[in-house]
């Protein structure tokens, strides 16, 4: 079975399912989204700018915690509707958690908005800078209290090598909490591969990787903890699958990366 380990909710849902069919992908793990670039009339800067501006505000951490929390409640409902409409295609999802809450309020949020919905992980987390990456520590602690739910953390720009190393330190201090290094660390992919190699609870996400070389090296170093993902609508399922099949060192690794690994991680 081929499972995309990260797709954001796309509208209409029927179009998202059609993309899975085109790529020969059986299932996808869903993540929430605030912007919807797939709704732009054309792929021009003019049409896509408004949706991408929302994304850049999130990545830049310019929203206060209250505003972001309020947004998350609505997009969780949007994701829940997609899962209910196609339970055989979207069998699992990660629930968003605001960064910047203290531990008791983070725990309360996870109980109310993640566990109640049956979501299997926490994220995507998008630290706006290296300092905000430290807030992941609280989430990791809460994860330990709530069944060791995996964390999915964005490690591409604006996160730097320093932020990635901070996340590696958090993985070391919480060895029983799976931490997915989203987008493979971007430009700092070599550091990220080394961290994942040295921490058995760390995982390497192959969506939006820096280059085919980074995918090839990751699958050679940590084939059992690499995850096929598209980050759709920002990535394309057909192209993302082809990247894995082209750069994988063996058919056995290809099978693991395209599905077996995420099945084992999320127990789906």
Regions found by a protein language model. Give the residues of each.
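An N-terminally biased module of ancient metal coordination in phosphate/nucleic-acid-related enzymes
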Residues: 1-74
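Mid-to-C-terminal alpha-helical segments outside catalytic/metal-binding sites
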Residues: 1-3, 15-27, 31, 225, ...
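Active-site neighborhood of phospho(di)ester-bond hydrolases with catalytic His/Asp-centered motifs
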Residues: 2-5, 29-32, 94-95, 123, ...
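Conserved, mostly hydrophobic/aromatic
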Residues: 6, 20, 79, 83, ...
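Acidic-and-aromatic substrate-binding clefts and catalytic sites of carbohydrate-active enzymes
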Residues: 6-14, 36-39, 68-71, 98-105, ...
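Alpha-helical scaffolding within the catalytic cores
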Residues: 14-15, 74-79, 105-110, 163-167, ...
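Active-site gating/metal-coordination segments in enzymes
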Residues: 51-152, 158
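Catalytic pocket-lining loop regions of alpha/beta-barrel enzymes
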Residues: 119-121, 128-129, 133-227
